[in-house]
Amino acid sequence: MGAILERSECDVLVVGAGIAGLVAAVQAADRGMKTIVVCKGKIAGGASYFPGKASLGIQVTKGASDYELFKGDIAQVAKGMNDPAIVDAYLTDSPHKISLLNKIGFRPWLRGDNRPACFARHPRDIFMISDWQEASRNARAIIGSSEHIVPFERSSLIRIQTDSGRIVGAVIERDGEYVLIRCKAMVLATGGLASLYQHNLYPGHLYGGGHATALEAGCQLVNMEYIQFIPGLVAPKNKVLFGEHTLKYCTGMVDQQGRDLFADLSPSASEALFVERSAYAPFSCDYASQIFDIRMMEAIRAGSDGVRLTFGANLYEDRSEFYAIYLDWLKRERGIDMCVDEIRVAPFAHSCNGGIRIDEHGETAVAGLFAVGEVSSAIEGANRLGGNSVGGALVFADRAIEKAAHYRDLHECSVSFDEMARDFQSWCAQFAAIESTCTATEVLKTVRQLLWINANVLREHRSLSDALARLDELEAAYSPLVHGFDAYHALAVAKVLMLAMLGRRESRGAHFRADYPNADPRVYRQIVAFHAGALEIRRDHQ
């Protein structure tokens, strides 16, 4: 184990430097709070700034008359899986938080068309952001010029430390050594977990470390089975977001051998299927067009490297804003013409609708520990409306800092650095006897393959159980003290995903069980927590 060479102290520790983390940091700095920002890469990284997409939207409540309509749209796709108090907080605050994007270097604009967001039934204001490189440069300049913010780049969260149910600090790894950070409040903004999948639309380091450390610290996870899978390009270039709206002009889908995957449908039925699927991005079993994603994954399981889509020339004749932004970006930045190039797609892991359980202030079950952005389970449920992800990051990062300021004023940490060091050393002792027979690279590669095939759009008991057994074997043969904590956290979160998917024996929203294809009339959420030292999943009936 590396030595503890550094000790730092702050009012608020922010872990993560995407949109949620940066908003938390600048809002804390505005309150005069000494803030440390820890991130695995550089400031302004993570999924927020991933360049494999043209733009991001932020959907906000459009006046008092829209309040109940928006709430209904959210409820329609949440399917009883979300928290009404958190939804109300978003509906109230979202119109007033767009300016927070300017504070971290973006230049948002209001979209000009009246197209409803993905899954939404009603149109409302949608603000857009893009220009990821410029926004990243701006954010780094903003953080670098703040007298209240200290960045810890290329650093990883290893352990969250608590005392009597309150946050006291964390252990960070930087350059092979450990750093103790004592704080009065902590904001987790570590993002999602899509990097656990072989094909994903995220940077390569999002393994769910925030989820794993929060769970060990006493937090609960909820809705972890609900992961969004969005078609992404595997050719002509890999890991590029596919614009689902282009399916309106799709003329066919074939596997690698050229077999028509909808040969059993009439031409009019195929056309209707593509049109319906063009209205939403993430897979959902709530629509008849679910067979688009299911047959795509069946072809992949049978050996196809994605499926090929063909398009009519009228695709490029549609110059409405939603089409023009994507198609122009695709040609300009990626050199792809969807009517000329061979377009092959597969289901890519994207956002996690579940995460750390929070209240309407972003606070977890641990006092003073907050979770914001994708690491949290916010307004999402079984699925999420387009444009609510970034909006949720803005609303709850701001709310978290407002509440964190009270801990700065009220809470004096009674735990010394020496006590924190002893706690960490005692925790590490559990790994000393493990004889590590596999490396982090081997573990992560295996995890990604297991989840890609067994915990994707298609799920069933046998494949999930077999994958879980393999994860147990890997965990028993891996020592984080020898090969690092990334793979340790990845294994922990992958096991949570498998258990949650096994536990929900029904199909709902983003979760499809081929062996349980219908929805259960009973509505419940699955809560994951440690109880008496063991991982436990209980049902919280709504």
What are the functions of these language-model segments?
Residues 1-3, 8, 27, 33, ...:
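Glycine- and aromatic-enriched mobile tails/lids
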Residues 43, 213, 220-336, 394, ...:
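An anion/pyrophosphate-binding glycine-rich loop and adjacent beta-alpha core
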